[in-house]
């Protein structure tokens, strides 16, 4: 009998029962809740006169709609100018109080983007099943978890039953071998992966990221990669548990205490793919050949090296790709063959659940070296992923490095990743963004998003256009 993959082990450990239609009832260990996808779920519970099945499995925090400007944030919920956004955050507060669910409220020092808060607080642990009404829940797979986004109706199901009916995915392994070059980060790795396999490459699969590059990668880096598994078409992304995982978890506020640690660690270390495990698909990439990446178009697969140019139509593999590129040229205001380093920028965003952890902020700050944001940059903002990340960055003096250079130092939240709060692009503005999606209108109506690493975003802010951070 063949060995099991990491995904197989996680699935089997949480499978309550198999159903005749091929689906399974899966137990959920951790449920993360925010203000956008939870109101209808709580309303459904109330209408059915149900209570949450397991209160301790749920944790909430507002993140999508919260203001990041300090003055507005200091006013709490009242500081949210948009009426709908304010109502959503207030409704989350009321629902959590009503149903006795723990919440890190808007001005709690632990508040932040759920996909940053969960791991840093030790609320997400290796071997767990983790769900949230947000597609980037795959982030938590970096800890050796089975983690994925769910819809609002499923949010209600988890609250009521602590289970979900799911169909098992196929197994895909993406191996990145060798060593990354100087200036190449986890964000560049995942963008290079998506450029290679496309945004549909992982459809129907759970992706395990493996190989020397991931073995050497920090937990923050692994979270960045797993975060964007959804952009590669997969619902799930994960990395096997190893010493890096264990060392990251140890001492976290909600992690097991000393009396429980030995038993917990022994269990967690079982979550890896057996040597004889069989994958449905395997992709191999030479990490030493990856350069800093920049997205030029309106899909995360429209990515090239910073040293390259916007592709020309003769490089398209088929008519469908040709049509997509033509539309992207027009929307992005770019020309085929234009050098990436010739793209002038208007705004810079360093943040999001992809790149707002302490390592990301350190990487960006290291590029500044006493320089100033370029005159043509209208706004450059840095948004820590949580209150704890912000406090740590301030203790290290990173905030002063940013503000002295001309960046704005903001309060935690999803911010400019998506046009759901006050942080938005104006039409036709180009933004170097450390977020995960560059769809039309993602950061604001008519806004033009370029996905990059924190270091690349910082360098672009200083130059006013894209530059190769390796030689900047």
UniProtKB/Swiss-Prot annotation:
Keyword Protein biosynthesis listed: no
Needed cofactors: [4Fe-4S] cluster
Coiled-coil portions: none
Record InterPro entries: 3-IsopropMal_deHydase_lsu, Acnase/IPM_dHydase_lsu_aba_1/3, Acoase/IPM_deHydtase_lsu_aba, Aconitase_4Fe-4S_BS, Aconitase_4Fe-4S_dom, IPM_dehydratase_rel_enz, IPMI_cat
EC number from the UniProt entry: 4.2.1.33
Cofactor binding note: Binds 1 [4Fe-4S] cluster per subunit.
Annotated GO biological process: L-leucine biosynthetic process
Protein's job: Catalyzes the isomerization between 2-isopropylmalate and 3-isopropylmalate, via the formation of 2-isopropylmaleate.
Family: Belongs to the aconitase/IPM isomerase family. LeuC type 1 subfamily.
Name of the featured protein: 3-isopropylmalate dehydratase large subunit
Organism: Psychrobacter arcticus (strain DSM 17307 / VKM B-2377 / 273-4)
Lineage of the species this protein comes from: Bacteria, Pseudomonadati, Pseudomonadota, Gammaproteobacteria, Moraxellales
């Amino acid at each position: 009998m063949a060995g099991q993959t990491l995904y197989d082990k996680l699935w089997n450990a949480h499978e309550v029962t198999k159903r005749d239609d091929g689906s399974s009832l899966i137990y959920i260990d951790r449920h993360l809740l925010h203000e956008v996808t939870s109101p209808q779920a709580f309303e459904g519970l109330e209408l059915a006169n149900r209570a949450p099945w397991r209160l301790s499995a749920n944790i909430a925090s507002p993140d999508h709609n919260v203001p990041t400007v300090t003055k507005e944030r200091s006013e709490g919920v009242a500081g949210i100018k948009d009426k709908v956004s304010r109502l959503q955050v207030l409704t989350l507060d009321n629902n959590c109080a009503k149903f006795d669910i723990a919440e890190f409220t808007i001005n709690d020092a632990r508040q932040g983007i759920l996909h940053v808060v969960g791991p840093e607080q030790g609320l997400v642990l290796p071997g767990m099943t983790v769900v949230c009404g947000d597609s980037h829940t795959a982030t938590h797979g970096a800890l050796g978890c089975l983690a994925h986004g769910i819809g609002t109706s499923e949010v209600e199901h988890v609250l009521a039953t602590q289970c979900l009916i799911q169909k098992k995915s196929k197994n895909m392994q993406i191996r990145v071998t060798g060593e990354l070059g100087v200036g190449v980060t986890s964000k560049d790795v995942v963008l290079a992966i998506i450029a290679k396999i496309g945004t549909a490459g992982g459809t129907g699969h759970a992706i395990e990221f493996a190989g020397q590059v991931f073995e050497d990668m920090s937990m923050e880096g692994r979270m960045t990669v797993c975060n964007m598994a959804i952009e590669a078409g997969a619902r799930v992304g994960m990395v096997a548990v190893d010493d890096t995982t264990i060392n990251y978890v140890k001492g976290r506020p909600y992690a097991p205490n000393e009396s429980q640690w030995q038993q917990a660690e022994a269990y967690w270390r079982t979550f890896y793919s057996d040597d004889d495990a069989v994958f449905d698909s395997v992709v191999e990439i030479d990490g030493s050949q990856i350069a800093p990446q920049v997205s030029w178009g309106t899909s995360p697969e429209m990515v090239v090296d910073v040293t390259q140019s916007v592709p020309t139509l003769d490089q398209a593999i088929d008519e469908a790709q040709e049509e997509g590129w033509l539309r992207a040229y027009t929307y992005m205001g770019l020309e085929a063959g234009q050098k990436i380093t010739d793209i002038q920028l208007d705004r810079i965003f360093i943040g999001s659940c992809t790149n707002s952890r302490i390592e990301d902020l350190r990487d960006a700050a290291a590029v500044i070296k006493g320089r100033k944001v370029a005159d043509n940059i209208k706004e450059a903002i840095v948004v820590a992923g949580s209150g704890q990340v912000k406090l740590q960055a301030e203790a290290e003096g990173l905030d002063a490095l940013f503000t002295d250079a001309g960046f704005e130092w903001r309060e935690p939240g999803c911010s400019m990743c998506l046009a759901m709060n006050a942080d938005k692009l104006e039409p036709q503005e180009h933004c170097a963004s450390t977020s995960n999606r560059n769809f039309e209108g993602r950061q604001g109506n008519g806004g033009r998003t370029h996905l990059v690493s924190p270091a690349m975003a910082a360098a672009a802010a200083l130059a006013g256009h894209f530059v190769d951070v390796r030689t900047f």
